[in-house]
Amino acid sequence: MKSRSLRVATIGLGAALGLLCGCADTREGPSGPFAAGSTGGDDASTGLSEDTATILDVGQGTMGGVDPDSVRGCDKVDFLFVVDNSGSMADEQQALIDSFPQFISAIDARIGASHDFQMMVVDVDAWVFGECSPACSEAAACDAAANCGVTEECGFPCALRDLCEQGDFACGQTQPESCEDVLGAGVTHPRGRGASATACDFATGARYMDANEPDLAGAFACAAKVGTGSSADTEQPMDAMVQALSSGSAAATCNTGFLRDDAILVVTFITDEDDDPTDSTGSPQGWFQAVADSKHGDDEAVVVLGLFGDNDQPQGLCTPLSHDFATGAEPAPRLREFVQMWGGRGHVGSVCAHDYAPFFSSAVDSIGQACDEFVPPG
């Protein structure tokens, strides 16, 4: 069993303990029209191949030569984004944020102008500061004995306390906000190291955004920058997804209004590690069934997009996850199996890609087709 709190605590030691060279991902930053300072050439500046750029000619209002006004199905889509907030995910979160405006513009063009979108972001732990209070107590005892940075026993709690404090956690003072400590609850105020550290204040007044958000791209960027300071022992992306979608769960109560019977569901998750049996409970088959159950058994009303490690695949982009957890990714056979269970409505991409726009563009037609064919229950 891996211990992620040990991992992030080790990252938190930094140069002070001389255990790591740093915690930032050293890959190139994301490219594309929404990356800061992007001035690339023709294909690089759009983040799309020539063929894909033709398909996504949003300015002409067409998708693959099809006039969206001539193909009308559902006009409601619920988007759930499950975003890993562990110590190695800073660049991946930024790549997701950079690709979002183009993705939503393409969806809008494919489905039509009378759209009704809702978007919610969840991270992969119950509370970013969940293990901080115990670390504070243990580190205080180490301080009293002058052992922080000296003994092996004190290395972990002292480092974890430092990590928590880097994310503006105050020992003995910081408490979770409403629903903030519920796994699968929509993120409204990302906290911890590297997070937006801003109350997103969605116009809906809920834990999700909708298409009427005055600055939708800005609101999504606020929520999706969940940071890299999670103190939890394990990453639980599939548990977070299941809890967010399961009727009667604590998260569902927090997320009231997000999941609608008359909308299709698009789940996107992004992580650089597999979801091992010691992390999320259940199996790919169980996760599939839980998501299908959230749509009253209609699995054709669901599209699933997964960005994760591909270094176990031919021509994969990822290098092995490095010991300092700053680069690469872990192969993710369980997550891959889950996505592939959705057939043509499951799309797999590399979390190590510098630009996620081509991946999202490849899924637009699947989302549009699911919407075209959707028949709401009742």
Regions found by a protein language model. Give the residues of each.
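Residue-level detector of intrinsically disordered, flexible termini
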Residues: 8, 14-15, 23, 34-35, ...
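Ser/Thr-rich, Pro/Gly/Ala-heavy low-complexity intrinsically disordered linkers and tails
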Residues: 19-72
